[in-house]
């Protein structure tokens, strides 16, 4: 029984789904691995490093697909790749079902089982497979680094003979995995950090990292049973906007991370709020692909509004692909270990297993 993986479009996606470390782990389950030639050369990982642990290489992606029962991907297959997929094979990756619904339906017509790992249930048994957490954590970190690069001022307070440099002030909107890492990173770099979230329960997490929590008074519970944020009422949005009017005038950098699963990102910073920031300030919108939290944010653009930089560069994983690939590949290995039956020597699609049933595209 073979697991395969092919090269992504490197200009758009630098991550890989299998590293030499996870290849060794997958093979230890009793599986074979097929990879496309020069699979991770762009990351400085040579084919020999894979071959040393028992991986077989093919010259073309179609050969890999034809010789593999399960295909690991990072992103949704291209139209050309879909044509080469075998019937009754298995596809695992991050496929953004709401965005790629038609493409995924086309694949399922070929009797292919698709598992999209961003649909994993939030249960303890699935934590080692949680691709959203592993990748969002890195995105939150990198968003702070990129914002500071664009800020053009020092971040920590510095006391010098020439005078005192004040600490930069950073506001994080959304205190999920990406937001909490953004808080921690900005704090370590010496910034004064505050954060806000629709979930009142996140107050303790923000404060544990040294951030100040900006609380919007609310009566409704805006947290799902799975711990995600829910859509807020118009009354709540008005209160949130009033709170942010004061915050936007004081902060130098804003990191936007607020998302609602299966829905467009909530628009939290309108044109008026963006323009309240000082000239030279920076807004990084991590939610830009889902519609964006901030006005003026556009995918893969840096827009300058009244001297304020609004950054919408997507897929920050391309800025640290080695680390992102390492974590993602480990997530995939954990999923395969759960899916593969050593006794049957085959993949076991057990719909009574919540991990399998929730991630399977039907």
Residue ranges, per PLM feature:
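Generic hydrophobic/aromatic pocket-lining and core-packing "Φ" positions
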Residues: 23, 47, 82, 104, ...
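Short, ordered loop/turn segments at secondary-structure junctions
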Residues: 8-10, 38-40, 76, 96-97, ...
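A structured beta-alpha segment of the ubiquitous adenosine-cofactor-binding alpha/beta core
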Residues: 55-69, 76-77, 223-254, 258-275, ...
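An N-terminal-biased, well-structured beta-alpha scaffold segment characteristic
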Residues: 2-106, 110
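Rossmann-fold NAD(P)-binding glycine/threonine-rich loop
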Residues: 98-124, 264-315
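Glycine-rich phosphate/diphosphate-binding loop of Rossmann-like nucleotide-binding domains
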Residues: 6-45, 154-249
């Amino acid at each position: 029984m073979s697991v395969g993986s092919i090269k992504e479009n490197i200009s758009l996606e630098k991550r890989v789904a299998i590293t030499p470390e996870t290849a060794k782990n997958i093979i230890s389950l009793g599986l074979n691995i097929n990879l496309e030639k020069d699979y991770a050369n762009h990351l400085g990982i040579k084919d020999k490093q894979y071959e040393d642990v028992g991986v077989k290489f093919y010259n073309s992606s179609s050969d890999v697909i034809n010789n593999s029962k399960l295909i690991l991907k990072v992103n949704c297959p291209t139209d050309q790749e879909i044509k080469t997929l075998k019937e009754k094979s298995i596809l695992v990756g991050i496929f953004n079902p709401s965005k790629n619904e038609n493409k995924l339906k086309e694949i399922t017509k070929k009797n292919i089982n698709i598992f999209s790992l961003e649909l994993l249930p939030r249960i303890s048994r699935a934590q080692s497979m949680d691709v959203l957490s592993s990748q969002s954590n890195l995105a939150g970190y990198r968003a702070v680094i990129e914002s500071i690069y664009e800020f053009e001022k020092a971040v920590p307070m510095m006391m010098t003979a020439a005078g005192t440099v004040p600490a930069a002030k950073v506001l994080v909107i959304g205190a999920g995995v990406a937001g909490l890492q953004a808080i921690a990173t900005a704090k370590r770099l010496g910034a004064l950090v505050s954060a806000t979230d629709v979930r009142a329960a996140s107050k303790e997490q923000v404060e544990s990292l040294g951030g100040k929590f900006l609380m919007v008074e609310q009566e409704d519970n805006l947290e799902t049973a799975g711990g995600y944020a829910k859509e807020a009422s118009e009354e709540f949005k008005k209160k949130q906007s009033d709170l942010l009017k004061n915050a936007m005038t004081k902060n130098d950098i804003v990191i936007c991370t607020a998302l609602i699963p299966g829905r467009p990102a909530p628009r939290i910073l309108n044109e008026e709020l963006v323009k309240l920031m000082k000239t030279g300030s920076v807004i990084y919108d991590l939610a830009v692909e889902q519609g964006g939290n901030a006005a003026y944010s556009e995918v893969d653009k840096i827009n300058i509004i009244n001297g304020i930089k609004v950054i919408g560069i997507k897929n920050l994983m391309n800025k640290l692909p080695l680390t992102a690939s390492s974590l993602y590949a480990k997530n995939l290995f954990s999923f395969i270990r759960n899916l593969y039956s050593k006794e049957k020597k085959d993949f076991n699609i057990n719909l009574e297993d919540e991990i399998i049933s929730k991630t399977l595209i039907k």
